[in-house]
Regions:
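Gram-negative outer-membrane beta-barrel domains
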Residues: 2-243
């Protein structure tokens, strides 16, 4: 009897060892692949770059144009937006706000009352635009279009011959439009880097210079083709909703 029990126990051990060895030889299923990257989601980020204003002023008294020279300045701010991806197509909206450090220095013009120069300083730029483009894995190539607004702390008109000047003329916010393009690259599922170029065109406006001795007679200036070109480097944190 004891002999049979020992034989049965030995058989059980051999059977268990055989099952264990067979299980060890079975292939382990591969982990599922990660979900494909998606640009869908809300994002927030920051940017820095440069801005180059353009355009001219025409005075009604002498009919002379004051051309805006090649001036560049620094911009820095942030953006908030939303993307929605459909296959390889992405649509979205974005709002930007940037502080501007630049001086708009218009050319010196000789007039019968002296050499006149006009300067102004932009203080901020804000935009609201749509972004539309193609997504290729971690890359997003897009075009951008919408509205733009620029804040200005007013013009200073100076008679360089007499050293007389008037400041704070026409401090205002000018409205206009924006058109641009850019490329964005996703480092991870949440962090992205981007480069963007934008052209901003603004509506023309008038402002008056009151007669002030020994300055110049009363005059009215009209802006022409007021524009700003911007190039930016930026980053975004994407709250990815696509997986």
């Amino acid at each position: 009897m004891l002999k049979h029990i020992r034989a049965a126990g030995l058989l059980s051990l051999l059977l268990a060892a055989s099952i264990t060895a067979h299980a060890a030889d079975m292939p382990v299923p591969a982990p599922p692949p990660p979900p494909p990257f998606s640009w869908t989601g809300i994002y927030v980020g920051g940017n820095v770059g440069g801005a180059a204003p353009g355009g001219s002023l025409t005075d009604s008294l002498f009919g002379i144009d004051f051309n805006l020279g090649t001036n560049t300045g620094f911009i820095g701010g942030g953006q908030l937006g939303f993307n929605y991806q459909i296959g390889g197509f992405v649509i979205g909206v974005e709002g930007n706000f940037d502080w501007v450090v630049t001086q708009n220095l218009h050319s010196q013009v000789s007039t019968p009352v002296g050499t006149i120069q006009a300067t102004s300083n932009d203080t901020y730029i804000t935009t609201a635009a749509a972004r539309v483009g193609a997504a290729v894995d971690h890359w997003f190539l897009y075009a951008k279009g919408g509205g733009a607004w620029v804040g200005n702390n007013g013009f200073t008109v100076t008679n360089l011959t007499t050293s007389a000047s008037i400041t704070g003329l026409n401090s205002r916010t000018n409205s206009g439009w924006l058109a641009g393009f850019g490329v964005e690259w996703a480092l991870t599922r949440n962090w992205t880097l981007k480069f963007e170029y934008d052209y901003l065109g603004f509506n023309n406006f008038n402002f008056a210079v009151p007669p002030t001795a020994p300055f110049i007679p009363g005059d009215t200036f009209t802006s022409n083709n007021r524009n700003i070109q911007m190039a930016q480097l930026g980053f975004n944190f994407l709250f990815n909703l696509g997986y």
